[in-house]
Every structure is written in C-alpha cells, then in structure tokens.
Amino acid sequence: LYIGSTDPLDPRHLQSLKTLIERTEPMLISEHLCWGAVNGKVLNDLLPLPYTEEALQHFCAKTTQVQEYLGRQILIENPSSYLQFAHSTIPEHEFLVAVAERAGCGILLDINNIYVSAINHNFDPSAYLAAIPVNIVQEIHLAGFENNGGCLIDTHSQPVCDEVWKLYHQALQRFGQVPTLIEWD
C-alpha cells in the first residue's frame, strides 16, 4: 500500500486486498511505516519517511482511510533504516506510537529492524523497546541481517543473531506472549 507515499491510495489495489481478506480471513494485516510510490509508479522498496509532524498527520490520515475501507484494524511495522532525514523532528519510536494512538492501529514490532537501525544510527535498542506502550504491540518479527562494511542490512538471509534474540526476550517480558514470525527470504 505504501501508506506514506503522497500518491492517493489505489482503489483497485484496496479492493483486491479487501477481497483477499474476506476470502482468507487473516488474523492480522500489516503494512510498513514507509513510502514507495511516486506518480503512480511503485518503486518496490520500503523507503524511509521524514519523521515530522506533517508526515505524521499524512500517515495517520491514510492509515485511517485504509482501516475504514477494509473495515478492520491494521498493524504498522517499524522499518529497518539506513539513512535519516536531517529535518526529522520526532524519534522513530515516538512517531510509530503516535501513528498507533492517532489512527487506532496496532504495531507489528520488528525486533531485527530495531537492532539494524540501532546499530546504523547509534541508539539504544532496549530504550526503543521500553518506549513502546505494552497494549499496542500485536505481532513481532525476527530476522537475520548482513553486515555490509559496518552498515547492517535487513536481508532475512541469515539466522537470527544472539543480540536480536536477547532483544526478543526483553520484548516478551515487556509485551507478553505475542504472535511471532521468523522471516527468511
């Protein structure tokens, strides 16, 4: 869906998604906190948002629009990050929580993405976890990454590392038993 894109939501894609949801009745539906379409062209990548109040309002409005169309709550997943916008004014974890609170969506917390971003941007991944309210995390993802000269890349091509397992155990202590998926591509 690329909710963060400035393009309007594609009504055909939304209808196809709604039909699939009605047919399969999934327990949860998620979308990344990202953008990836410009002028009707899908870039097929999860591109980062500037974490500003303007981007937050935009993302919340489109998340609400998606939920209203689908007739159900969706989850928003934190991305892995390789760059940051200089004009961002809101830390990612605060932005993610604000989306959940304002749009009434849940959070899919990707522990590997937190770790990858923490190493790439030099922040404490445990503090990120501690800043997420307990009642809004509805799913957790784990995965492996590759180290590309000091920049960690979320590839899903490696086993889950010990540090991510440790963060996962912290997450379970904080959020309780949450459905968890190990991603492998």
Predicted regions mapped to residue ranges:
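Conserved radical SAM core fold
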Residues: 2, 36-43, 144-151
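Gly/Pro-rich active-site loop or hairpin
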Residues: 8, 46-50, 56, 118-175
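Active-site acidic/histidine proton-transfer and metal-coordination neighborhood
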Residues: 10-106
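A residue-level signal for conserved active-site and pocket-lining positions in enzyme catalytic cores
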Residues: 29, 110, 180
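Acidic/histidine-rich catalytic cores of soluble enzymes
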Residues: 67-151
